[in-house]
A protein has these predicted regions:
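Short, highly charged C-terminal tails/helix-capping segments
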Residues: 178-185
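Beta-strand/loop substructures that line and gate deep hydrophobic ligand-binding cavities in soluble
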Residues: 92-95, 107-166
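Coil-to-beta-strand transition motifs
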Residues: 19-23, 101, 140-144
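Hydrophobic pocket/interface hotspot
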Residues: 36-40, 48, 94, 147, ...
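Glycine-rich portal/gate segments that line the openings of hydrophobic small-molecule binding cavities
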Residues: 19, 29, 59-119
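Short coil/turn motifs at secondary-structure junctions
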Residues: 31, 80, 152-154
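Hydrophobic ligand-binding cavity/cleft-lining segments
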Residues: 1-72, 83
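C-terminal functional regions of eukaryotic proteins
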Residues: 164, 168-178
Length: 185
């Protein structure tokens, strides 16, 4: 059963735990009557998230694949929780963009090796990850966003920290929402 952990700044964070797997889901609306929101819906949104979250994300590497609608993305997180014995992590995924008239999805699945991406930090990969960033285009000025994801870490998190990945992603999306709603043309 899904439970709402928090709703901060219009970004709702849901949580569901089944055995060892934890699923998170964010829901939010982004409205700005001064800027066409649909112009932000491409792979550069990940670079914008990086720019807005330098305290959480060390860097994001993006590598074009053979198809224009698919990228290999490596998100290196800052060393969060090292005082609790947690190592620095990175999330490596193959992300495909699917687009229709009023909807864009970025579907990410686990990628096991880095290929051309060279990390200059000592970080460990997240064991397993998947995500779906679903953006419904209500109008050029209004987006409904749902981000569903799960992460399986090599290291077992203490019970009081198991919601931390969701809370960090929620913080990233609060900043994205705030930025997009406050820019002007």
């Amino acid at each position: 059963m899904e439970h709402e952990i928090s709703n901060r700044n219009g970004v709702s964070l849901m949580y569901k735990k089944n055995d060892d797997q934890i699923d998170f889901k964010l829901n939010l609306e982004i409205i700005n009557n001064h800027v066409y929101m649909d112009t932000f819906i491409d792979f550069n949104i990940f670079k914008l998230i990086e720019t807005l979250n330098t305290d959480i994300i060390e860097c994001i590497y993006m590598e074009q694949t053979d198809t224009l609608d698919t990228m290999n993305i490596c998100m290196v997180l800052k060393p969060i929780g090292k005082e609790f014995g947690l190592s620095q992590k990175y999330i490596l995924s193959r992300t495909t963009k699917l687009q229709s008239v009023h909807n864009v999805q970025f579907i990410s699945s686990d990628l096991k090796e880095l290929s051309a991406i060279k990390l200059n930090v000592k970080a460990e990969p997240v064991k397993k990850n998947s995500a779906n960033l679903n953006i419904d285009i209500m109008s050029r000025f209004h987006l409904n966003v749902t981000y569903s994801f799960n992460l399986e870490l090599e290291t077992e998190l203490p019970i009081y920290m198991e919601k931390l990945p969701g809370q960090l992603i929620q913080k990233m999306f609060i900043r994205l929402k705030t930025f997009l709603e406050n820019i002007s043309s």
